[in-house]
Amino acid sequence: MYPEPRPAPCPGAYYEYNNRMNINRRSLLIAGAALASTWRAHSQNSGDVIIVQQVVDRIKAKVGIPWLAETVDGLIVGSPGIQVHGIATTAMATLDVLQRAAAASLNMVITHEPTFYSHQDATGPLATDPTYLAKREFMAAHEIVIFRLHDHWHGMTPDGIDTGMRYELGWDGHQVANSDGEFTFATSQLREFSAAMAARLGARSMRIIGDPKLPIRRVIASWGYSSLMPDLIKAAARPDVDLIVVGETREWELVEYVQDQIAAGANKALIILGHVTSEQGGMKYCAKWMKDFIPEVPVEFVPAAEPFYQLKQR
C-alpha cells in the first residue's frame, strides 16, 4: 500500500506552520542525517546497487521516443552518481510527498509536475524564500533526488497519463477506436456519472457545470490543463458530445463557452477535476511501468494530496 497523503490543512494551519518553520527545519535535518546513515548501512549489505544515472538511462530507453533537446524533463535536484534506495512516482513533488517518500526509504522521486512552483522549475526568484529553502534543506538532509517526467510521459504511445487514467477510472473498454480521449458509455445522468468518477478518483472538490439530470453518453477527456482554443473548441462544439472532462482550465475560456452553450439551449456539461486529481492515475501507472525495468529497488506510487476542500466538508 502506498503512503497515504495527509489531508489539506485548513487555512489557520498555515499560521502555525510559519511559526514553527525554524523548529521543524532543525528536526528534519537531524532526522534526515539519521535516515541517510541507515540507507548507507543497508546498501552495504545489499547486492543490488543502482545509481540515479542508470535509472535515467533506462527511462530514456523505455519511453519509446527520442529524448527531446528542449524539455522540462530531467534531473531537477541531486546528482547522477547518487545511489538509489527506492523510487517514488508522484503527480507533484510537494513537501508532504517528499516527507512520505523519505519515511518509506524512497530517495529518488519521479514527478510529473514542477517541484519549484513554475513550469520550468526556475529557482532564481526563490533564492531567499523560506518555503523554498525549507524544501531544499529537507531534500539535502534526506539525500532525495528529483527527476521530472512530463513531456516524454505524455509523448509516449499511448500517452502515459491517458493510459493510467483509463485504468484508474475503469474506462479502458469505453474508448472510441483511434480517438484521442473520446469515450462512449451506456446512458446515465450527469449526477450519477460524476459521482462515480469522484468515487473512483477519491475526488472531493470536483466542479460541475450542467443539468444534474443530463443524459451522458459521449465524453471527451483532456487531463491536466486544457485550453478552449485550439485544444477543445472543435470537441466542445460537437452536438454529439455530452460532457467535457478536464483537470483545469481558465474560467473565461472553456467554462464561459460551456455556460453560453447551455444558455443557448445545448445539452452540455463540464467537469473540472483539479490538475493533480486528473493526472494522478497516470503516475500510479508510471510506478507499475517502471517496476518492469527497475528490479533492484522498490518502486512505489506516492499520491499527492488533493489541495482543495469544500466548506461543507469542514
Predicted features along the sequence, with ranges:
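N-terminal secretory signal peptides
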Residues: M1-I23
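Hydrophobic structural segments
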Residues: N22-R314
